[in-house]
Design a protein with these regions (language model features):
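C-terminus-biased signal that marks the final domain/tail of proteins
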Residues: 1-107, 199-240, 246-357
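Internal mixed beta-strand/loop scaffold within catalytic domains of large alpha/beta enzymes
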Residues: 91-192, 328-331, 340-343, 349-350
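Alpha-helix capping and helix-loop boundary segments enriched in small/acidic/polar residues
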Residues: 194-197
Length: 357
């Protein structure tokens, strides 16, 4: 199986309308799964979740009214309400804030690598996306052609989201790791922040957008550019911390690593994030001539199974519910050659398919 692909053209509303019409089935899956997830993890009814998501509207409007128009188009095309699209785009803030570190659910292993660690000095980045297994059916591939100012976008969101992990024709990539914080505030939801970052052409611009304005939740954003540079930014309502590649390698999982954050944030409640970080370091650090194939192999790694880099359900015999997590895709991006390699589901079970920007 492969994800549905949609190319969005026209005005922001027209883009959203195309998105909603083309991905109506996948968006319905997102709505159904988030109704269950908000109830399971946060004890929220769907109406309560919709109401809570409205607090982020002022920050979205202040950033770009076009994003509001695009989300309205998605709602109209998919036959759902605007608030439901908004809740999908604010799902990180609704799910992950107000949680202690003991509530950690494993999500994602990310990397970036460049000279002197790669073969022919190519620049690579990527991640696994580990989340509720049922949401695997809701992932789509979104393309938005450039307009002469903003580059061509290629990203891989959950259906209904207008931002996500991906890359652009300027050779900039973006990956995401979930982090947890007890703090909560107003501000721009991380997936809207990610859309703005992907519209940038330089790493400096991307960094400025990553740290712009208040952050209502905690997240780790790894930004990499074909120029052979990368920045990793840990954000939460109290501030930011920045990590840089060491000898051409940068890796991150789901706990805080920045020097400031190590002093102010609790340890993670799950050992998975530490084990996956250690495995990523073993697979990428102090290596030479790293390639796309090497990264793909790393995403099939089962050390620490089932909560490994290639993650599998801990109770596979049980009926599949939103409580079961697994790797939903593996993504490797070659920024030098503007190519992405995507494996649906567990990379140990499915091939990586090449997609050009």
């Amino acid at each position: 199986m492969m994800f549905k692909e949609v190319t969005l053209i026209g005005t922001p509303y027209e883009r959203g309308l195309q998105y909603g019409q083309t991905c109506k089935e996948e968006i319905a899956i997102s709505v159904r799964n988030y109704q269950a997830l908000f109830a399971l993890r946060k004890n929220l009814t769907w109406e309560q979740a919709l109401q809570l998501s409205r607090r982020y509207l002022p920050a979205i409007r202040a950033l770009d009214e076009a994003y509001i128009d695009e989300m309205q188009g998605i709602a109209d095309g998919a036959g759902i309400t605007f608030d439901e699209v908004l809740a999908i785009n604010a799902r990180t803030e609704l799910l992950h804030t107000g949680l202690s570190s003991d509530d950690l659910v494993q999500e994602c292993t990310a990397f970036a690598t460049m000279a002197p660690a790669t073969k022919d000095d190519v620049v690579l980045a990527g991640q696994t996306w580990d989340f509720t297994l049922l949401q695997r059916q809701a992932v789509v591939i979104v393309r938005i052609p450039g307009d002469g100012v903003r580059p061509d976008l290629l990203f891989f969101p959950e259906a209904g989201m207008i931002g996500g992990k991906g890359m652009n024709s300027a050779g900039l990539s973006l990956t995401l790791n979930a982090l947890r914080t007890k703090e909560h505030g107003d501000g721009l939801p991380v997936h809207l922040r990610m859309r703005r970052i992907l519209e940038c052409t330089t790493l400096n611009q991307a960094y400025e957008q990553a740290v712009r304005g208040a952050m209502p939740s905690a997240a780790n954003l790894m930004m990499t550019h074909k120029d052979g540079v990368a920045l990793d930014v840990e954000l939460d309502p109290s501030g930011i911390d920045v990590l840089l590649p060491q000898r051409g390698v940068l890796v991150h999982t789901n706990h805080f690593l920045g020097p400031k954050n190590l002093l102010t944030h609790d340890h993670a409640g799950s050992g998975s994030t530490y084990i996956r970080l250690q495995r990523a370091q073993q697979l990428f650090c102090d290596k030479q001539a790293l390639t796309v194939e090497h990264a793909q192999a790393a995403f099939r790694d089962h050390k620490g199974y089932p909560t490994s880099i290639c993650a599998h359900p801990t109770n596979p015999a049980n009926p599949v519910t939103v409580a079961q997590n697994a790797t939903n895709f593996g993504l490797v991006m070659d920024l030098t050659h503007l190519e992405a390699w995507l494996a649906w589901g567990n990379p140990c079970e499915n091939p990586f398919v090449k997609i050009t920007v």
